[in-house]
Amino acid sequence: EMCIRDSGFNDNRRYGLKEAVHIIDGLKSQGFSVMLGVPTQWRALEGDTESDPRLHELIRKCDIMMPWFVGRYNETTYPKYQKLVEEDIQWAKKNQVDYAPLVFPGFSWGNLKGKDHNSFIPRNKGSFLWTQLTGAIRAGAEMIYVAMFDEIDEGTAIFKCAQKVPVGKSTFVPIEEGVESDHYLKLVGEAAKILRKEKAIAYNTKLNPAG
């Protein structure tokens, strides 16, 4: 499987739908399945999306689609996007494309751009991520794209993180107090069990649902 990221955005990127079609057609001709990353508002062709209906044709060429949600909402504003996911899934099923909604644990520009550009979405000790995971599953998702395993630049990493900074003064931010170093990996693992029908979905956002 190959993933082609960020097609259809309206921010004047150096590539467009024409280039994406060429790449996807080439991959499909060689037997690859293709996942296409698209903007949040891909279905309505508004907001972060260019108003070109050819994007929908491009999506139909692919096996899986994944809308980019990082930075679009926080735990308070998420419910509107859960409804968006539900409607996206209906479109995807009608058009015979698999749909992988994106979830992310939190966000910060602090590492990449410095404190002066520190747009921040709190993790809330995993509550934000768990709300998205269970929300996507309730909306009908059969697969989920987690952003990201090791993305430090935008503060979305879910990998194990120390609870104490092992050096002197540093911009490194340790994992939140009161959670284990692999807390976010556990949350994702629990969601995977639910997707595989190995356990029922938990109707709450308590920490460490495995506990």
Predicted regions: what they are:
Residues 1, 5-211:
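Glycan-processing catalytic domains of CAZymes
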